[in-house]
């Protein structure tokens, strides 16, 4: 093996190292001997060459594979290539000997290796100490290299802020370790010229690594243009390539596999069930806690910072012109998934709605009925409605309407104080006890001295009003209660009418002086002569079912008690009212079995005559409940369950129909000064649905006032007679009486004034019944009440 070939195999850089024992391995080369031989003794070349031959032979003992691995591992920056070694030999050898070496190398290179210019990638320069310094060329990588293109002006300081070099004239180092000087900055004029003549790729920014203006390349500008124009940055990419239907182009009729579905796909997994049951058992036994409460150490740990998001929350004030959006109306019954049947449209309504234009429809949808909430489908107009709502909120102008700051109490009429409206009854003065059972009715005589009462025991009792002493009593029936007692108006006689069972009894109580008693008996006996003069009815008239009853004389026992006449009505009468002259009175039999033609009867006292003014049932409102004569006109007011009708008896015409709006009328009364001082007719109505209604016939057929102060049904209402005191009262099943002030004037422009005055309580509720009747003293502001507890009370 020749020397040139060995030198070609291994060439080392000449370095000054300490002389040590030569250790040859696959990773290190001892070039100290070779370097010393070339530099110290130029005349011992032959001996040195022999030594080098031995060294080279030792090196050649290694395999070629190890040489290749060593060449790959050695760094090119630390160990020079073959060209570098030969160049070093040229510089260190003698001129004559160096030429021989070069000649040998050239001969070998011409035969075995490329030219020296292609292999050498460095140049030798002298450093500051005069030593040789190898300067390598920049790496020019090819397509197969791992290196990228190296910029000539690249700053290789790494990820270091340039602020570290603010105090130095340079800004970094290049790959050779040379300083990269800070670029010169132009003056104001240069900056102006640069701004006028903007070069292509100018950005106005400064490159942080070089300090020079940052310019974009043509490729970067083209990329920015495509991004700005929403174009595809990559060239040659077609986003609209034709779709290849790989799986749907051919229709497969037969299944790919006809194997039946395995049972495990639709049967619950037993293994999963076992795992779940293990977890459930562990949870039940407490070995697994679904929620582990925090320990006291965690709660009291001060190192854990807990932030309160709403600690510093402050409400933001609304804009001065802020107007809140109007709220949507709440949904109605028609929007329910299971609405009532009356809200569901019929076929005709549905067809009409479908044929109408959307603008002409009264609603945006039709109510539908679903059996359950899970059957309700999605609402198809949901998005449309929300969009229209957004349009309304966005486009519709809003107007702030200023509310009137009016005190609600100022809108109410100024009512006088109850203290200014005295006298009126405030306390119970006398209690009348003696009846067994309920006291259903009572009445005060026109003189104001006597009180008559009737109850469930079938007796009529007369009391002295002020003392409460019983003066007279008569038992009219053994089984039926006394429903009504009324005194004949007028002071010329003392006649008491009472309705018990199917009969009407007329009596003269023996409690007055003989002259008054004789005058009363004469009035009752005068009718017997007129009745005897009337010719008897024909056989055809006698065979009629609903003939008027004939007045009869009472039995001897009743006659001895003071009863003078009996009228057999054949039906139970619940209402009895006298005409103001005292010659007529009207009775009402409201029973459901009572024929309509005999329900209302008018009786003439002077003729002992009974007439039926109505041949047919009053239309609407059910059977009649009560009837009263007008205090100054020949008008009869008849009330059924829901309406009150006024009939002119002289002309036999229907004058007016009143609609109180009550479900069941219990009683009513007419103002005593109607059409005289007040200029119009006024009446009050009580109903079983707890309402007290005031009617002004000149205003409307509807109630002028509706008062709801009772908790239970109202049984009776009554005006103070004579009109001396503008008072009226009502009696209710809640055990109380309520006293009202109700004044009317002759001025047609002013309405009635109604003021609640007093609530009188004293009767006990017995069998869900309280106060059953009420009446006034004819001259004093006193009232008397009858209760279901078997007592009567005088309120003063």
Curated annotation (Swiss-Prot):
One example GO MF annotation: large ribosomal subunit rRNA binding
InterPro entries membership: BOP1/Erb1 (IPR028598), BOP1_N_dom (IPR012953), WD40/YVTN_repeat-like_dom_sf (IPR015943), WD40_repeat_CS (IPR019775), WD40_repeat_dom_sf (IPR036322), WD40_rpt (IPR001680)
Compositionally biased intervals (Acidic residues): 47-84, 102-119
One Pfam family per UniProt: WD40
GO cellular component entries: nucleoplasm; PeBoW complex; preribosome, large subunit precursor
Biased composition range(s): Pro residues: 326-343
SUPFAM superfamilies on file: WD40 repeat-like (SSF50978)
Keywords: Nucleus, Repeat, Ribosome biogenesis, rRNA processing, WD repeat
Predominant location category: nucleus
Ranges of compositional bias, category Basic and acidic residues: 123-134, 345-366
Composition bias type Basic residues, residue spans: 1-12
WD repeat residue intervals: 434-473, 477-517, 619-657, 660-705, 709-750, 766-796
Signal sequence residues: none
Subunit and partners: Component of the NOP7 complex, composed of erb1, nop7 and ytm1. The complex is held together by erb1, which interacts with nop7 via its N-terminal domain and with ytm1 via a high-affinity interaction between the seven-bladed beta-propeller domains of the 2 proteins. The NOP7 complex associates with the 66S pre-ribosome.
Annotated family: Belongs to the WD repeat BOP1/ERB1 family.
Purpose of the protein: Component of the NOP7 complex, which is required for maturation of the 25S and 5.8S ribosomal RNAs and formation of the 60S ribosome.
PANTHER family given in the database record: RIBOSOME BIOGENESIS PROTEIN BOP1, RIBOSOME BIOGENESIS PROTEIN BOP1 BLOCK OF PROLIFERATION 1 PROTEIN
Protein's name according to its UniProt entry: Ribosome biogenesis protein erb1
């Amino acid at each position: 093996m020749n020397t040139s070939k060995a030198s070609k195999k291994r060439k080392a850089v000449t370095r000054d190292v300490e002389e040590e024992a030569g250790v040859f391995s696959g990773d290190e080369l001892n070039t100290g001997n070779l370097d010393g031989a070339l530099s110290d003794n130029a005349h011992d070349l032959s001996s040195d060459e022999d030594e080098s031959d031995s060294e080279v032979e030792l090196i050649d003992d290694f395999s070629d594979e190890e040489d290749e691995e060593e060449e790959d591992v050695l760094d090119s920056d630390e160990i020079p290539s073959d060209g570098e070694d030969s160049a070093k030999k040229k510089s260190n050898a003698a001129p004559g000997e160096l030429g021989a070496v070069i000649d040998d190398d050239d001969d070998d290179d011409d035969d075995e290796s490329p030219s020296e210019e292609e292999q050498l990638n460095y140049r030798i320069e002298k450093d500051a100490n005069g030593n040789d310094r190898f300067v390598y060329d920049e790496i020019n990588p090819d397509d197969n290299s791992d290196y990228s293109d190296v910029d000539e002006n690249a700053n290789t300081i790494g990820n270091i802020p340039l602020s570290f070099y603010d105090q130095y004239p340079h800004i970094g180092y290049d790959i050779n370790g040379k300083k990269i000087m800070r670029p010169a900055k132009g003056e104001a004029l240069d900056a102006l010229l640069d701004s006028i003549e903007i070069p292509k790729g100018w950005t106005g920014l400064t490159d942080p690594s070089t300090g020079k203006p940052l310019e974009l390349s043509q490729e970067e500008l083209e990329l920015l243009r495509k991004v700005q124009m929403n174009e595809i940055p990559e060239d040659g990419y077609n986003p609209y390539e034709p779709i290849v239907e790989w799986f749907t182009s051919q229709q497969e009729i037969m299944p790919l596999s006809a194997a039946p579905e395995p049972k495990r796909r639709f049967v619950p997994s037993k293994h999963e069930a076992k795992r779940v049951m293990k977890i459930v058992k562990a949870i039940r036994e407490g070995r697994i806690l679904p929620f582990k409460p925090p320990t006291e150490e965690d709660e009291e740990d001060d190192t854990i910072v807990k932030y309160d998001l709403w600690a510093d929350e402050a409400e933001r004030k609304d804009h001065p012109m802020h107007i809140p959006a109007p709220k949507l109306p709440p949904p109605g019954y028609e929007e329910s998934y299971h609405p009532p049947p009356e809200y569901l449209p019929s076929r005709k309504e549905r067809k009409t709605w479908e044929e109408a234009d959307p603008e002409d429809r009264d609603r945006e949808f039709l109510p539908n009925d679903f059996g359950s909430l899970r059957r309700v489908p999605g609402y198809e107009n949901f998005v449309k409605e929300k969009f229209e709502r957004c349009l309304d909120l966005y486009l519709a102008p809003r107007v702030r309407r200023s509310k009137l700051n009016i005190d609600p109490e100022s809108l109410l009429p100024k009512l006088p104080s109850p203290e200014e409206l005295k006298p009126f009854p405030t306390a119970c003065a006398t209690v009348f006890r003696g009846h067994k059972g309920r006291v259903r009715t009572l009445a005060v005589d026109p003189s104001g001295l006597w009180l008559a009462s009737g109850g469930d025991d079938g007796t009529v009792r007369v009391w002295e009003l002020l003392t409460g002493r019983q003066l007279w009593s008569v038992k009219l029936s053994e089984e039926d209660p006394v429903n009504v007692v009324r005194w004949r108006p007028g002071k010329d006689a003392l006649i008491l009418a009472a309705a018990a069972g199917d009969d009407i009894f007329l009596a003269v109580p023996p409690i007055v002086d003989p002259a008054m008693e004789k005058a009363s008996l004469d009035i009752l006996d005068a009718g017997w002569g007129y009745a005897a003069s009337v010719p008897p009815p024909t056989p055809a008239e006698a065979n009629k079912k609903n003939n008027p009853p004939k007045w009869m004389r009472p039995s001897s026992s009743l006659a001895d008690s003071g009863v003078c006449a009996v009228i057999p009505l054949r039906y139970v009468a619940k209402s009895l009212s006298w005409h103001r002259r005292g010659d007529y009175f009207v009775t009402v039999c409201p029973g459901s079995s009572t024929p309509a033609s005999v329900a209302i009867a008018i009786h003439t006292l002077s003729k002992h005559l009974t007439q039926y003014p109505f041949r047919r049932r009053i239309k609407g409102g059910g059977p009649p409940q009560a009837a009263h004569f007008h205090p100054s006109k020949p008008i009869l007011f008849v009330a059924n369950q829901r309406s009150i009708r006024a009939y002119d008896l002289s002309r036999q015409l229907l004058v007016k129909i009143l609609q109180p709006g009550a479900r069941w009328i219990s009683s009513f009364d007419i103002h005593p000064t109607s059409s005289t001082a007040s200029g119009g007719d006024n009446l009050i109505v009580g109903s079983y649905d707890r309402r007290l209604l005031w009617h002004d016939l000149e205003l409307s057929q509807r109630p002028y006032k509706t008062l709801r102060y009772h908790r239970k049904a109202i049984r009776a209402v009554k005006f103070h007679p004579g009109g001396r005191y503008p008072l009226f009262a009502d009696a209710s099943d809640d055990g109380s009486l309520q006293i009202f002030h109700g004044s009317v004037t002759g001025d047609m422009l002013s309405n009635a004034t109604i003021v609640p005055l007093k609530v009188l309580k004293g009767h006990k509720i017995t069998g869900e019944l309280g106060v059953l009747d009420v009446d006034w003293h004819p001259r004093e502001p006193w009232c008397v009440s009858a209760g279901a507890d078997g007592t009567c009370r005088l309120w003063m």
